[in-house]
């Protein structure tokens, strides 16, 4: 599917001419096993990695180096008591985790994990399916997973899960727009929305370098999409316990937990496909022909997705949770305008290349550098003046309708009793508490 009127080279799509039903079945089973195995590995890597970053051992009892800890947790979830709230909408309560898990596992259907390989004498691409609008399929399925979260929060008829569901829906809407705009520049450069053709277009240069601003926007939006720190507001433990998962137990909770980590693998795979050359070998190994053929592609794909997985784990260990207003300001007032501005520049430069014979990486490197410099200048000069604080007319008493409340802007806080306490008075109070009879006699 050609998107632009420019003279974009037509890249070769995946060849499914020898595909059979049993090959498709084998690849579907392989994708499920691949995702579950990577989730188990991700749990171990995250816990050991966080322990290392926080100067503690992490899991080290269940198996060598704690490798079996994830299996122990899975067994615990399987045999936990299955409970639900009495007022819950029973059908939707059970359906919601299944929707979230189904949407998470469906994304990999159109992800090219390698070039054509030979299986039992049949040449087939390491991809379950491809279509001219495969990238739109990914965005649509990612949005479908939101229904599992919203229905799960609403069907429990409980306050905290509903808060988590509303937060999650606002978060996905805010950051999926910026993510979609960052991917449009990839479609313009590749001339297609087919994932296999996008990978083929990155045979020489990865879009992560040519379209660096779009790559950065995608990475930030991807973290918000999967509800990970510092954007885990739908599951903020200190505010709403576990968000939409608060009233779930046993394997229903396990499906939500599994879908969260599968979604991490999904956004990593999409980043690899759209910006990191897909299954192509990294430079300088890309110049060795046999390293870009056969089963080698699966190795490069695996290493690239784990590069992004490690970045998300590292981010969790490093950054604190954003405040909700900061989070929404970042999505709507920062990422969206930057993504739109970059998209306009990409379309403009794509048209200029029809008249100026310059390599894409040179032209976009210069334009991208100027774009980033302009953003830095705007950021440094955009210092809003603090608004004057109007003094409150009411006297601060420390209580409002019987509840303790903090002072409003302009009100003077009450003096703390501890601020005026003396050492003699403190010792006398402590002595009275230790010897109440003597204090009464006095």
Predicted regions mapped to residue ranges:
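Selective transmembrane helix interface/packing segments
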Residues: 2-442
């Amino acid at each position: 599917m050609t998107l632009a009127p420019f003279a974009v080279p037509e890249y070769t799509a995946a060849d499914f001419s020898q595909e059979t039903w049993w090959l498709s079945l084998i690849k579907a089973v392989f994708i499920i096993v691949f995702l579950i195995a990577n989730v188990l590995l991700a749990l171990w890597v995250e816990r050991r990695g966080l322990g290392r970053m926080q100067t503690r051992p992490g899991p080290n009892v269940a198996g060598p180096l704690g490798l079996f800890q994830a299996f122990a947790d899975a067994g615990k979830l399987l045999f936990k008591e299955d409970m639900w709230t009495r007022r819950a909408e029973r059908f939707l309560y059970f359906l919601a985790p299944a929707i979230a898990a189904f949407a998470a596992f469906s994304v990999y259907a159109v992800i090219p994990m390698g070039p054509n390989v030979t299986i039992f004498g049949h040449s087939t691409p390491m991809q379950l399916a491809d279509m001219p609008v495969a990238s739109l399929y990914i965005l649509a399925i990612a949005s479908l997973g939101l229904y599992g979260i919203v229905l799960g929060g609403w069907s429990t008829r409980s306050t905290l899960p509903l808060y988590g569901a509303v937060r999650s829906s606002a978060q996905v809407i805010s950051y999926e727009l910026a993510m979609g705009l960052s991917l449009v520049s990839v479609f313009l450069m590749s001339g297609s929305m087919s994932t296999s053709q996008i990978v083929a277009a990155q045979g020489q240069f990865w879009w992560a370098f040519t379209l660096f601003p779009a790559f950065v926007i995608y990475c930030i939006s991807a973290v918000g999409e999967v509800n990970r720190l510092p954007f885990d507001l739908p599951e903020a433990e200190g505010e709403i316990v576990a968000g939409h998962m608060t009233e779930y137990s046993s394997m229903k909770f396990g499906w939500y937990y599994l879908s969260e980590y599968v979604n991490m693998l999904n956004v990593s795979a999409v980043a690899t496909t759209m910006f990191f050359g897909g299954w192509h070998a990294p430079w300088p190994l890309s110049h060795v022909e046999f390293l870009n053929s056969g089963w080698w592609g699966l190795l490069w794909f695996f290493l690239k997705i784990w590069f992004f997985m490690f970045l998300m784990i590292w981010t969790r260990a490093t950054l604190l949770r954003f405040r909700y207003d900061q989070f929404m300001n970042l999505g709507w007032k920062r990422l969206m305008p930057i993504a739109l501005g970059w998209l306009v520049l990409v379309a403009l430069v794509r048209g200029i290349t029809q008249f100026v014979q310059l390599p894409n990486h040179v032209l976009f490197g210069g334009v991208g550098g100027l774009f980033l410099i302009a953003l830095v200048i705007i950021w440094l000069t955009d210092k809003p003046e603090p608004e004057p604080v109007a003094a409150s007319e009411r006297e601060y008493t420390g209580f409002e309708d019987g509840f303790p409340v903090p002072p409003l802007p302009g009100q003077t806080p009450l003096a703390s009793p501890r601020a005026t306490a003396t050492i003699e008075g403190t010792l006398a109070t402590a002595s009275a508490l230790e010897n109440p009879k003597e204090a009464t006699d006095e």
